[in-house]
Amino acid sequence: MKKKILIFSLAYYPKHIGGAEVAIKEITDRISPDAYEFHLVCNRFDSTLPRTQTIGNVTVHRIGLTTNNPTMGDLRKLPLHLNKLTYQWQAFWAAKRLHTTEQFDGVWAMMAHATGVPAGKFKRAFPGVKYVLTLQEGDPPEYIEQKMKPFGRTFGEAFTRADTIQVISTFLGKWATCMGYVGVPVLIPNAVNTGHFTQPYSETDLDAARAELGKKPGDVFLVTTSRLVYKNATDDVVRAIALLPANVHFAVYGTGPDQTMLEKLIVELGVTDRVHLLGHIDHAVMPQYLKACDIFIRPSRSEGMGNSFVEAMAAELPVIATQEGGIADFLFDETKNPDQPTTGWAVNADSPEQIATAVNDIMTRPEKVQTVTTTAQAMVLAQYDWDLIAARMQSEVFEPLFRDT
């Protein structure tokens, strides 16, 4: 018999999405609607969006405060910024109302800090409904726990009431155990659209992207696709640029609260002609611009997993990163991980000097770069494809969850 699952997510398509929302859509699009019926409760944010809408295999129910056609930046301002707080109660009541007519077999919460509170409350109210929690958090656990302290034990119940916890990294699995989950977390990482990021581009297309970037012959372009926030350490790359030869540039695709700080730092270090803040990039054209550059970098101070790294590996770019959090599951360094096939260049957090050393190594060892990028792409194709991940979610999470019902 078909099972009905209600998903809790702060946001959803078509606007204001991140890696968590991408994961929901990629997974649900690949699961047969004959086996599972998905509903989702999220914030509406934009008054032009309908309150109820079917997107792919998901029926979306929107709640919360709205303004007309807000930007991502508007979501961090009043009144929309209040939605993160009010969702903790409104989502529970919306789910409760929906349950009276839909009679859900299970609920699925996307990230503990975002939706674990309403999902845990729903499980307390309806103990017969199965509950899956997915951990995709990128911030340090201690920061999240401090932030959620006002919710008291209800935040802890996001973990302890879960029938299954699925995590995207070993690091997050350890956090689930520390928070009181008594089962064994199911480790299923996020994935990427491998066909999208491995697609070939003509030299004409790549030259067009290079021209737009202002890339000249002999230039080496580092690139990142990252929110401009503290954890992503874009500032460390800017500091590293000042230590590198004048032909090394840094293309930054992303927006966020750190932008003003970065603009000041770029001026202070005298690298205004070599660091390019390019704003948002559409996912549809991202592979073209990645391949027009030479090195992907994000020296994260914390990371749940990081889809951007895997996307860059699929595009056959050499990757420089830390091994913080979930990155350690897939980025293996020649020196730090001699027992693993090398898939990237690992640096310590907060170390512009190590970043500069890694960039110089990549620029002077083309044979190593070819070997590493080939190895990394093969790993991504074998382990991080959405078809594989969706199949694993069905066989390792949903089917066992409902086996006895």
Predicted regions and their residues:
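A short, well-ordered alpha-helix in the C-terminal region of glycosyltransferases
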Residues: D361, K368-A382
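Short hydrophobic beta-strand element within catalytic cores of glycosyltransferases
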Residues: P318-A321, G326-L331
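A short, histidine- and acid-enriched strand-loop-helix "catalytic/donor-clamping" loop
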Residues: H113, A125, Y131-M148, T164
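Conserved acidic donor-binding segment of nucleotide-sugar-dependent glycosyltransferases
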Residues: F330-P352, D361-P366
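Aromatic "clamp/platform" in nucleotide-sugar-dependent glycosyltransferases that forms part
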Residues: R301
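Carbohydrate-associated surface elements
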Residues: F171, A191
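Conserved donor-binding/catalytic core segment of Leloir-type glycosyltransferases
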Residues: L6, Q166, K216-N232, V238-I241
